[in-house]
């Protein structure tokens, strides 16, 4: 495992393989990390085919520095861009799982010359509003009055902040047409009970180019 120290002196944990051709970067989902089954499956494929590959932990996740509630989608976007700009070499294909699919779209918009393709695995861009609506009355009141609330999803408790929802709104990618001219693959299970099955259709409706 290696670490990249960003401008805030935070360490971002990552693992990489050196190989040939386009690079591949795997981006994990909310409250997941680079050691998830999907990330490791892609890594095995990259190793078998001798491809350049990077998986990393966003801050507040896995082995990277910080507490989850200290960061937002804006920070995790910066983490991905730091990996693209300072760790990865040359053109990249981004593979994003759930929230990682949102981050990959933000990165493709910010670094169009570097990103040559995107693969979304149950990609979940712009989920901030849906997540807020899933909160109960107590959670919503705490977010709006205290700025933070403890939320439990699928038996896993974590903290959500008012800033998290504000930054989520600022970073929406499907609010208007999303100009993108490179290959895009969206893989989504029809029985997914976390990310709605109409999300990939919404993405395709907004992507132009």
Task: Tell where the protein language model's regions lie, with residue ranges.
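The serine-hydrolase catalytic nucleophile loop
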Residues: 31-43, 198
